[in-house]
């Protein structure tokens, strides 16, 4: 939910969100109520781009780099084009990105998308600056409530005929969080059980409760059709 009392630090096309978690979102398309077909949600860091945006050292370098210097993981840009275009190559299937990267590096990320010809319908950034301002330092690296909240905000708007395909990596917890999201959408994980699951993963209690409250606004259905995870960790946990 946007708070109109917040200062307008972001350009008009970006939505400042404070609940269920601080984030900044840009939506460029609303799907018609009768839409029936696939939609795709992608992570960015280590799923599309070979970067570490979510780590402090990586984030600090981004504003000083050129978008052309950022490297996509092999094959991912072609895959994004194919998913977007569909079999007819002109379907413009819905494509969204959710990233724990902070909004201040959005220009570098979106410029890279422009260079690579990647059309997208929405992108959500974790508002790390607001989290820091709130002195919730443990939430800077803990992404559970952010990612579930961002996903549920999208799910609430998807038409009933949407079939969701999700792409992430194992550098963090994408597989687990995507599975939790699938269970939330299907009605298998709601209420106090959802709050406890988030807190056990490190989410703050008040964020966990806000995510659980948002989940009640999402109609129960089997929304998620497939989850694809890029394996970047070694068996011993190394990267």
Region spans (language model):
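A solvent-exposed, charged loop/short amphipathic helix patch at secondary-structure junctions
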Residues: 50-70, 185-203
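A metal-dependent, Asp-based hydrolase signature
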Residues: 51-54, 61-63, 67-73, 97-118
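Short, surface-exposed connector motifs at secondary-structure boundaries
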Residues: 86-96, 158-163
